[in-house]
Curated annotation (Swiss-Prot):
Localization (cell): Nucleus
Residue intervals of every PHD-type zinc finger in the record: 363-412
Record protein name field: Inhibitor of growth protein 3
Site (Histone H3K4me3 binding): Y365, M376, D380, W388
Keyword Zinc-finger assigned: yes
Source organism per UniProt: Mus musculus
Covalent link location (Glycyl lysine isopeptide (Lys-Gly) (interchain with G-Cter in SUMO2)): K148, K165, K167, K256
Main location: nucleus
Chain positions with N6-acetyllysine modification: K181, K264
Subunit record text: Interacts with H3K4me3 and to a lesser extent with H3K4me2. Component of the NuA4 histone acetyltransferase complex which contains the catalytic subunit KAT5/TIP60 and the subunits EP400, TRRAP/PAF400, BRD8/SMAP, EPC1, DMAP1/DNMAP1, RUVBL1/TIP49, RUVBL2, ING3, actin, ACTL6A/BAF53A, MORF4L1/MRG15, MORF4L2/MRGX, MRGBP, YEATS4/GAS41, VPS72/YL1 and MEAF6. The NuA4 complex interacts with MYC. HTATTIP/TIP60, EPC1, and ING3 together constitute a minimal HAT complex termed Piccolo NuA4. Component of a SWR1-like complex.
Any Gene Ontology CC annotation: nucleus
Length: 421
């Protein structure tokens, strides 16, 4: 898991390279601008003194002015080529970043399916600023969750801590307090329902699908999992700012070092049909599944199908009332639908290619009919149908000096020249 470190090492020299190239580009821009100002002054003087001097002097001055204009034009073309080189440099680093992210996501998904979506959403929630209240929330009485840390009025003027530190400390304190409460309550025995998992069931104020912590492991309670998440956030808070991927990696390492087995079960979102009537049923089914997984001595993970869930719940709760048994047996179809909706692991992610794939709508250039990449050179013929060419396709290793024409335009110009002769 060294993708982040390798990429940071790769772009370590990028700011200095960009600064040097932008400085050179600025110097060339000033040079072109000064040359244009001098040429305008010379042109005005030329027209003022044209009638007073001989035709030979006028032709000589005219040729000199045209020569200086062409030199300024070449400098401007060189400045444009430098800008294209800067763009290609940044574009190569962006493509490399996309490739490394795809590889990292594939490795995470191979070990724990669905974990990348949760970690990415958590990172976005931590980094995104608090949004203003819109009309939907203004009319509804649901309070809008604010993730920004609000210091007390007594210390507001004295403290100047960054906003990201506020968010990390707020989340850390919340996770630690939840973990202490759940560890104090605990689970009395293996046959009792897992009451420590109720804090992570479906939340009515979240429209998005939240990760069901109750199904993460069979031997560890939600308190230990919360403590692991708190340690991950604390490790992330100690890192330097600007490394957003560190939070994702720290969270993954915290779960991995504590030997937590991440499941594939997600809690359903608000928009699913029958949410208000089946939320209690989902809570009961989740508790029965976790209690039956705790009761199994072999330590194997509990299956998410309907048969094993109903058999284990009936065997573990033989002394319970007949109403709960009839509830579980009559809702088998609901369990199947929920399990299908809750598994948010698209097959396209697992089968997606790691290599960068180009957009089919991206324009094609060069004689090879490929997209723009690397260093390219433009044909100075305004009517050229292709216009841009890769260095390797036209046999160039460096930027040409002066005007350059592609092989097709060069051949066409030679044919026209031979016809005129």
């Amino acid at each position: 898991m060294l993708y982040l470190e390798d990429y940071l090492e790769m772009i370590e020299q990028l700011p200095m390279d960009l600064r040097d190239r932008f400085t050179e580009m600025r110097e060339m821009d000033l040079q072109v601008q000064n040359a244009m100002d001098q040429l305008e002054q010379r042109v005005s003087e030329f027209f003022m003194n044209a009638k007073k001097n001989k035709p030979e002097w006028r032709e000589e001055q005219m040729a000199s002015i045209k020569k200086d204009y062409y030199k300024a034009l070449e400098d401007a073309d060189e400045k444009v080529q430098l800008a294209n080189q800067i763009y290609d440099l940044v574009d190569r680093h962006l493509r490399k970043l996309d490739q490394e992210l795809a590889k990292f996501k594939m490795e995470l998904e191979a070990d724990n399916a669905g974990i990348t979506e949760i970690l990415e959403r958590r990172s976005l929630e931590l980094d995104a600023p608090s949004q203003p209240v819109n009309n939907h929330h203004a009319h509804s009485h649901t309070p809008v969750e604010k993730r920004k840390y609000n210091p007390t009025s007594h210390h507001a003027a004295a403290d100047h801590i960054p906003e990201k530190k506020f968010k990390s400390e707020a989340l850390l304190s919340t996770l630690t307090s939840d973990a202490s409460k759940e560890n104090t309550l605990g689970c009395r025995n293996n046959n009792s329902t897992a009451s420590c998992n109720n804090a992570y069931n479906v939340n009515s104020s979240q429209p998005l699908a939240s990760y069901n912590i109750g199904s993460l492991s069979s031997g560890a309670g939600a308190g230990a999992i919360t403590m692991a998440a708190a340690q991950a956030v604390q490790a992330t808070a100690q890192m330097k700012e600007g490394r957003r991927t560190s939070s994702l990696k720290a969270s993954y390492e915290a779960f991995k070092n504590n030997d937590f087995q991440l499941g594939k079960e997600f809690s359903i979102p608000r928009e699913t049909a029958g949410y208000s009537s089946s939320s209690a049923l989902m809570t009961t089914l989740t508790q029965n599944a976790s209690s039956s997984a705790t009761d199994s001595r072999s330590g194997r993970k509990s299956k998410n199908n309907t048969k094993s869930s109903s058999q284990q719940s009936s065997s573990s709760s033989s002394s319970s009332s007949s109403s709960s048994l009839s509830l579980c047996s009559s809702s088998s179809t609901v369990v199947q639908e929920v399990s299908q909706q809750a598994t948010v692991v698209p097959e396209s992610d697992s089968n997606s290619q790691v290599d960068w794939t180009y957009d089919p709508n991206e324009p094609r250039y060069c004689i090879c009919n490929q997209v723009s990449y690397g260093e390219m050179v433009g044909c100075d013929n305004q009517d050229c149908p292709i216009e841009w060419f890769h260095y390797g396709c036209v046999g160039l290793t460096e930027a040409p000096k002066g005007k350059w024409f592609c092989p097709q335009c060069t051949a066409a110009m030679k044919r026209r020249g031979s016809r005129h002769k």
